[in-house]
């Protein structure tokens, strides 16, 4: 029977992480458990930086972006000797289990800790929406709002100057955020990691639009596919139309979480604690068809490539 749990946020931050921490803390306290907040993810766990949390520790946190516990990427956690120190730090405080909030890298850490005797439950927190076992991740919908707002603003100035605008969106190797934002923002062209990309074909499509009388256009592209500044110069040279690239960058991770992310994070935080109380370990929570679900972390890590929303792309192309 667990009496003390720890909670940490790891990897890239996402709007709604504070709401998830709040869900963990308030649910645990309602079940008479003690909760320790661990600062800066696995790095703080290794450095033994943690503090006891009460219900007031998470007051006024549900609407705040970022994570008040802090987050960090800590590649050293892959080393067994580093994890052994982390486990010893937990044992010294008699912390029985952990809730880990983050993306696939955070899942790997939770998987390894579980194998070392620390029961872990993972919560998907990333704007990329690239984690298996869930329809949506915490932060995705807030980032989507941010991206669409940026696209709306770009459309205003692109229209004024009859310009082609390229907007680079986060997502790593998953195009969910780009695709949804492109549909909501009315983008004329979409470049995703899930589809074959040739700049020559993109230029041909843009040129065809110009010949039909299109005065401006917005191209939404997922990060890491190409150098968007070079792509902008290439398009401008081939079309003789002013072209500018905008990299949204880390602004996509900031801001107060939207309503859906607050609810999702609260539900996931509470559910993670419930699973620990029931004796589960090495699991990751998710939402599927609006219901809370859980899967083995190991299975999720084996199937991280999400099913591509091909029907969404087909719809988007009809709306160009």
Curated annotation (Swiss-Prot):
Q: What class of enzyme is it?
A: transferase
Listed binding positions for ADP are 22-26, 55-60, 155, 186-188, 212, 214-216
For this protein, the record's Gene3D superfamilies field holds: 3.40.50.450, Phosphofructokinase domain
Residue positions annotated to bind Mg(2+) are: 104
The cofactor named in the record is:
Mg(2+)
Q: Which CDD domains match?
A: Bacterial_PFK (cd00763)
The record lists the catalysed reaction(s) as: beta-D-fructose 6-phosphate + ATP = beta-D-fructose 1,6-bisphosphate + ADP + H(+)
What are the BP-aspect GO terms?
A: canonical glycolysis; fructose 1,6-bisphosphate metabolic process; fructose 6-phosphate metabolic process
Q: Where does ATP bind?
A: 12, 73-74, 103-106
Give the annotated active site: 128 (proton acceptor)
GO CC annotation terms, alphabetical: 6-phosphofructokinase complex
Where is the protein localized?
Answer: Cytoplasm
Q: Which HAMAP family match?
A: Phosphofructokinase_I_B1
Q: What is this protein called?
A: ATP-dependent 6-phosphofructokinase
- Organism per entry: Buchnera aphidicola subsp. Schizaphis graminum (strain Sg)
